[in-house]
Curated annotation (Swiss-Prot):
Disease tied to this protein: A chromosomal aberration involving IL2 is found in a form of T-cell acute lymphoblastic leukemia (T-ALL). Translocation t(4;16)(q26;p13) with involves TNFRSF17.
Chief localisation class: secreted
GO BP of this protein: activated T cell proliferation; adaptive immune response; cell adhesion; cell surface receptor signaling pathway via STAT; cell-cell signaling; extrinsic apoptotic signaling pathway in absence of ligand; immune response; interleukin-2-mediated signaling pathway
Signal peptide (residue range): 1-20
Source organism, top-level taxon: Eukaryota
Cellular component terms (Gene Ontology): extracellular region; extracellular space
Keywords: Adaptive immunity, Chromosomal rearrangement, Cytokine, Disulfide bond, Glycoprotein, Growth factor, Immunity, Pharmaceutical, Proto-oncogene, Secreted, Signal
Subcellular location: Secreted
Glycosylation sites noted in the Swiss-Prot or TrEMBL record: 23
Entry protein name: Interleukin-2
GO molecular function (one): carbohydrate binding
Alphabetized PANTHER family for the sequence: INTERLEUKIN-2
C-alpha cells in the first residue's frame, strides 16, 4: 500500500535532484566566472586608485545606481544596466598613465554577467535611493562577488 507512494516520492525526488540541483561542475563554473568578474572589477578599481589620476576628482562626480539589495546572481542585472555609464566614465580617464581598455573590460564583464544571471532573466532591478561614486560602486560589486564566492566554497 505504501510501496506506490514511496516509489512516487523517490521518483519525484530524483527528478528534482537531476533537473534543478546544481552539480559540482556547474557550481565550479559559476565560481570561476565570479572570480573572473571579481578580477575585472578589481582591475578597474586598482587602475583608478593606483596612479596620480588628475581626472579622478571629475570621475567621482558621476553617480551610479546600486540595487537596494544584491545577494543573488539575478541581481547582476543591476550591474549590467550600469555597464554603459561605467564605460563612459572610464573613457574619461584615458591617458598615458592609465592603460586600461574600458571597452574590452566592459565587454568581458558583460559576457560574464550574462552567463551568470542567464539571458532569460526578467528580473527588474530595484535601486537604492542613494547613488554611489565609481569607487563605491566598484567596491560594492567586488564585495558582492566575494560574498557569492564564499557561499559556493
Amino acid at each position: 500500500m505504501y510501496r506506490m507512494q514511496l516509489l512516487s516520492c523517490i521518483a519525484l525526488s530524483l527528478a528534482l535532484v537531476t533537473n534543478s540541483a546544481p552539480t559540482s561542475s556547474s557550481t565550479k563554473k559559476t565560481q570561476l566566472q565570479l572570480e573572473h568578474l571579481l578580477l575585472d572589477l578589481q582591475m578597474i578599481l586598482n587602475g583608478i586608485n593606483n596612479y596620480k589620476n588628475p581626472k579622478l576628482t571629475r570621475m567621482l562626480t558621476f553617480k551610479f545606481y546600486m540595487p537596494k539589495k544584491a545577494t543573488e546572481l539575478k541581481h547582476l542585472q543591476c550591474l549590467e544596466e550600469e555597464l554603459k555609464p561605467l564605460e563612459e566614465v572610464l573613457n574619461l580617464a584615458q591617458s598615458k598613465n592609465f592603460h586600461l581598455r574600458p571597452r574590452d573590460l566592459i565587454s568581458n564583464i558583460n559576457v560574464i554577467v550574462l552567463e551568470l544571471k542567464g539571458s532569460e532573466t526578467t528580473f527588474m532591478c530595484e535601486y537604492a535611493d542613494e547613488t554611489a561614486t565609481i569607487v563605491e560602486f566598484l567596491n560594492r560589486w567586488i564585495t558582492f562577488c566575494q560574498s557569492i564566492i564564499s557561499t559556493l566554497t
